[in-house]
């Protein structure tokens, strides 16, 4: 295979380790080979004194990384190989933890879609640079899963109930909104990205601070009062009731999302964010893996991926079908 066809391109020069996610037709979704290759590169560069920073990008111009390859994960389940899916997730979560533990700058240039696993390989690093074309989200409730890759550690520490809103609805943040929320650290206009990349590849980490533009309070800050009022209500039924009481277009849109995603995933996500507030990142990643063992075999994951990404009929048949039918006993069992 030509190296330029490899799913991960890893090079080093000028004291910089450069990683490029290279599955543009799959929006750079992470598969097992990519996770293993990233982990190998990180293992090599972590203790190499010649490497002063690591730069991560996505190839193709459309996406940084659209997430883990959940279609592949669903196929593993359908073929009766759920153990392979858990093995993949275990290695992915270990990579997330290794990025967080790195004592060197880990710089992600996010100029396009960044969701799920893409958040996982960026948010735990030191520098997350977004452009106005960046689109960030944790939309796992849409596919019957939960916000994993250690994102519960980040979501649970956002101001007020911002993490509950983003984790439950999968709301999308554009550009500087991701800095406001805490997923990103710096905003740089796309037109300034080539010069910034060149400076970073020359080992100039200070170029980020010189290039980044200030992010004043904007749309995310403006939503804080209603987000806190509704998504801080304390339980999924209480959140629904609070949104119904708002009688605004925004509240109705959020209600529609909550009625559309997996009811079971909503309850799992709400509980995991509650627990995450008392955990460190390794604890959150351990919770992710334990939950993955109980949630991925549950019907909603395979069904959610089928409806959104395989058959694309956007008509998932959830188990159970509504928020009102979710059993607290079922949710508690998933947490062991």
Please report, for each region that a protein language model flagged, where it lies by residue.
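Long, low-complexity C-terminal extensions of enzymes
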Residues: 243-249, 258, 262-336
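Hydrophobic/aromatic residues within transmembrane alpha-helices
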Residues: 56, 69, 121-122, 177-178, ...
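Amphipathic alpha-helical blocks and their helix-capping loop/short-beta junctions
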Residues: 183-261
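Conserved CoA-thioester-binding segment of acyl-CoA-metabolizing enzymes
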Residues: 1-57, 97, 333
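Glycine-rich beta-to-alpha active-site loop
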Residues: 99-143, 165-166, 170, 175
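Contiguous mid-protein beta-loop-alpha structural module that forms a pocket-lining wall or clamp
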Residues: 148-205
């Amino acid at each position: 295979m030509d190296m330029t066809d490899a799913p991960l391109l890893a090079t080093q020069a000028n004291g910089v380790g450069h990683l490029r996610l290279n599955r543009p037709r799959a929006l750079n979704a992470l598969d097992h080979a990519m996770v293993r290759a990233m982990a190998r590169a990180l293992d090599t560069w972590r203790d190499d004194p010649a490497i002063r920073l690591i730069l991560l990008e996505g190839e193709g111009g459309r996406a940084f990384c659209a997430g883990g390859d959940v279609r592949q994960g669903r196929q593993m389940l359908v073929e009766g190989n759920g153990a392979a899916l858990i093995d993949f997730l275990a290695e992915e979560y270990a990579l997330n933890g290794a990025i967080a533990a790195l004592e060197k700058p880990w710089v992600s240039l996010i100029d396009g879609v960044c969701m799920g696993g893409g958040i996982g390989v960026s948010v735990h690093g030191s520098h997350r640079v977004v452009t106005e074309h960046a689109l960030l989200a944790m939309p796992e409730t849409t596919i019957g899963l939960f916000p994993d890759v250690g994102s519960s550690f980040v979501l649970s520490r956002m101001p007020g109930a911002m993490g509950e809103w983003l984790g439950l609805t999968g709301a999308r943040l554009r550009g500087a909104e991701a800095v406001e929320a805490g997923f990103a650290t710096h905003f740089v206009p796309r037109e300034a990205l080539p010069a910034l990349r060149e400076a970073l590849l020359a080992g100039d980490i200070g170029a980020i601070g010189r290039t980044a533009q200030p992010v004043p309070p904007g749309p995310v800050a403006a939503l804080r009062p209603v987000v806190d009022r509704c998504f801080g209500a304390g339980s999924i039924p209480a959140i629904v009731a609070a949104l119904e009481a708002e009688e605004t277009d925004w509240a109705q849109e959020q209600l529609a999302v909550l009625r559309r995603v997996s009811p079971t995933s909503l309850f799992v996500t709400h509980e995991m964010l509650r627990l995450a507030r008392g955990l460190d990142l390794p604890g959150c990643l351990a919770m992710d893996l334990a939950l993955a063992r109980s949630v991925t075999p549950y019907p909603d994951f395979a069904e959610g991926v089928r409806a959104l990404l395989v058959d694309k009929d956007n008509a998932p048949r959830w188990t159970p079908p509504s928020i009102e039918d979710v059993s607290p006993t079922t949710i508690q069992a998933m947490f062991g």
